[in-house]
Amino acid sequence: MLTLYHQERSPDATSNDRDETPETVVREVHALTPAPEDNSRTMTATLPPPPAFRGYFSPPRSATTMSEGENFTTISREFNALVIAGSSMENNELMTRDVTQREDERQDELMRIHEDTDHEEETNPLAIVPDQYPGSGLDPGSDNGPGQSRVGSTVQRVKREEVEAKITAWQTAKLAKINNRFKREDAVINGWFNEQVNKANSWMKKIERKLEERKAKAMEKTQNNVAKAQRKAEERRATAEAKRGTEVAKVVEVANLMRALGRPPAKRSFFSFS
């Protein structure tokens, strides 16, 4: 077998080198217990090389081999310590998880018992619901541990949410009732208003019809009065025209008579007796 310096080595040296190679040892993990070292391995590490190859092995190389073995032992111990610490942390987490789970189960059982012994639910939305039930042991002021306080605060929060839900439902129902009543009243008011408007329009149309009838009658009467006045005026005009014609004829006749006699008209006429 060839070495680092291209020299052949004997099978004995090869077997010695194989002995120097660290073996994989399967050990059980114990609390900080160092693993027993192999005597053959220690002896192999301390044996000198064969005489034929003593010139090729220097003292620093042997010292390096020994320091590597010590470093490997130290690393193995540190690895074992890390494995033990990790396993202990996992065990602690598992134990903590189991304790928390058992505590939650116990709290669930207490809550179920509390629900079984709970009083009848109040259906009145205006009822005052107490924050705590007497004798239930859920008083936050009592010193029963953080788990009991957490359960008490949870129960109080649930009660507050229930009361708030009831108040919200009552408020919604009341507002809906008020809004529906207002809508009905608004519909009634709108109907009454429309009725009054229709009644006023009907009265106005009736008055307009009466006014049209009266206007027609007044127009007819006016036309009759105008026609009558026109007839009377024509009669009076005819009478005045006839009188004027008669007087003109008298004056012409007197004037002709005076011309015939040759006498001028006197201050007081003979024919004027008035």
From Swiss-Prot:
Probably ubiquitinated and degraded by the 26S proteasome pathway. Residues 1-30, 231-245 have a biased composition (Basic and acidic residues). Keywords: Cell membrane, Coiled coil, Membrane, Ubl conjugation. GO terms for molecular function: kinase binding. The keyword Ligase does not apply. Disruption phenotype: Slightly reduced susceptibility to Beet Curly Top Virus and Beet Severe Curly Top Virus. The double mutant rem4.1 rem4.2 displays resistance to BCTV and BSCTV. Forms homodimer and heterodimer with REM4.1. Interacts with KIN11. Belongs to the remorin family. This is Remorin 4.2. It comes from Arabidopsis thaliana.
